[in-house]
Structures are given as structure tokens and as C-alpha cells.
Amino acid sequence: MQIKNASNLCEYMFSNCSRTGICFYAIPSTVKVENGSPDGNGGFGIAYKSTSEDYGMLIVFSYGKAVYMKIKSITWDNWKKVKFIE
């Protein structure tokens, strides 16, 4: 799915994903940090929603050569930059 504009990137990705589904999104660089983007560079994202719809996870692969993760339990955590061992 292409995200054109989102006031809250996380809620947009999460709400448009079906239960126990995994959804893939293209995120343009027009989705800025103030709209929920982790770095404003665009990229692509993966969203997962639990059966109860209370829990989920978002992973964003940024065009800025970084990977970010955000988890929802009751509320959303902050974006965490994933560090890889090279």
C-alpha cells in the first residue's frame, strides 16, 4: 500500500492492517517526523496486528539506511533504531 499522507504514520499503518495480518507499505519522504516517521527519509514499512488488535509491531526500513522498530502494547513506544553487527 502506498501511504500518501498520514497525520499519524503508526496509527495509519496499524489501523489498515487486518487482524493477525502482516501488511507492507511504501512510505514516501513527504511523511515527515511530525507525522510519525522515524527520520523523515521515506522507505518501506511492515505492520503486524495481533488477534485482539491491542498489540502490534511496526518495522520501517528507511531510505536513510537505517531500520526502526516500534511496538504497541497499550500505547505506542518510541521508535527504536535497530543496530546491526557488521
Region roles according to the model:
Residues 80-86:
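C-terminal interaction-tip segments
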Residues 1-65, 71, 75, 80:
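Glycine-rich, flexible loop motifs
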